[in-house]
Amino acid sequence: MSEEGKITRSIHVIPLKRVYWGRRTNRADRAVRLIRKYVRRHFKEAEKIIIDPAVNEYVWSRSREKPPRRVIVEIRFDKEEKTAKVLLIRSSKAKIMSANSK
């Protein structure tokens, strides 16, 4: 975790495998809710959680029924405004693709 004044930055790997336990028809919806729940658990002081559209697009990229198993995000927590912003670092698919190209 790095701190620059009032903003705390941290990188998290959020596992989304629990959304596969339920019905197929709303897995991406539950994945977004799980991300919000994860951030709320780790940043208890956060009153507002903002999920970047890139994170949402990545979760929905393979349709509603097949969200990714995990997502790597950077969470920026502003202590004064008590907001947590969730930003996409990279997809695990991009990490695998770059490893295969070497």
Swiss-Prot record:
SUPFAM superfamilies: Ribosomal protein L31e (SSF54575). GO terms for molecular function: structural constituent of ribosome. InterPro entries: Ribosomal_eL31, Ribosomal_eL31_CS, Ribosomal_eL31_dom_sf. Pfam families: Ribosomal_L31e. One of its GO terms (biological process) is translation. GO terms for cellular component: ribonucleoprotein complex; ribosome. Belongs to the eukaryotic ribosomal protein eL31 family. This is Large ribosomal subunit protein eL31. It comes from Staphylothermus marinus (strain ATCC 43588 / DSM 3639 / JCM 9404 / F1).
